């Protein structure tokens, strides 16, 4: 039989191999980019999920405010960092809340707490600590204020806003709150000390007829 042989220049013979090498390089670049993007996506998703879990652990599910544990923790951290600065601790309690639950039902009671939580957010500064620390009890830490009078005026403002706040589910009836105030560092240098003093002031507000603000005096 016959055998045909072709003699090709070396450059022409290498062209197919060069094409394969270029293709492999392009493929590897695309592969590395895709893997990098996938890793970044996984890291981002994990970070977002961890933030959501942390927020869930720190907040009260009903109102979106801080829960009691986080309120206490943030307050203690603030007081330990800013020992020489003046802060006010307010305890707010919805007056006759048990009657609201008894008359309108617990579902309406939850709505009242939710809407009051929104009212708190709209009244105080973004940097202040707002928490739900009991069933119908809320705590507010007003950071870095000059005098107790500032806290008193803000509490009276909230008192007026609450009494004028319309909640449709209450069918024409409004809610009121009582407020007790203590201050740091005068009345204490930790959450529990400030809570106890503000709670005493709150008790005095309740005894004096509710729907009012009382300061703690040692």
Q: Across the structure, where does each feature detected by a protein language model lie?
A:
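Extracellular/periplasmic juxtamembrane segments that couple receptor/chemosensory ectodomains to their
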Residues: 1-27
């Amino acid at each position: 039989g016959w055998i045909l042989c072709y003699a090709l220049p070396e450059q022409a013979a290498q062209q197919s191999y060069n094409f394969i090498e270029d293709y492999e390089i392009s493929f590897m670049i695309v592969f590395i980019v895709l893997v990098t993007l996938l890793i970044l996506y996984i890291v981002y998703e994990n970070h977002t999920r961890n933030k959501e879990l942390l927020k869930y652990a720190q907040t009260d599910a009903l109102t979106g405010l801080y829960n009691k544990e986080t309120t206490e923790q943030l307050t203690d951290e603030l007081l330990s960092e800013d020992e020489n600065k003046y802060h006010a601790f307010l305890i707010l309690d919805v007056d006759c809340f048990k009657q609201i639950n008894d008359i309108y039902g617990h579902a309406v009671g939850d709505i009242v707490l939710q809407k009051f939580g929104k009212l708190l957010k709209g009244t105080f500064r973004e940097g202040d600590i707002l928490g739900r620390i009991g069933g119908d009890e809320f705590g507010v830490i007003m950071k870095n204020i000059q005098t107790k009078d500032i806290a008193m005026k803000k509490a009276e403002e909230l008192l007026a806003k609450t009494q004028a706040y319309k909640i449709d589910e209450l069918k024409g009836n409004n809610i009121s709150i009582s407020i007790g105030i203590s201050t740091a560092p005068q009345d204490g240098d930790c959450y529990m000390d400030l809570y106890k003093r503000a709670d005493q002031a709150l008790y005095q507000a309740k005894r004096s007829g509710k729907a009012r603000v009382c300061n703690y005096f040692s």
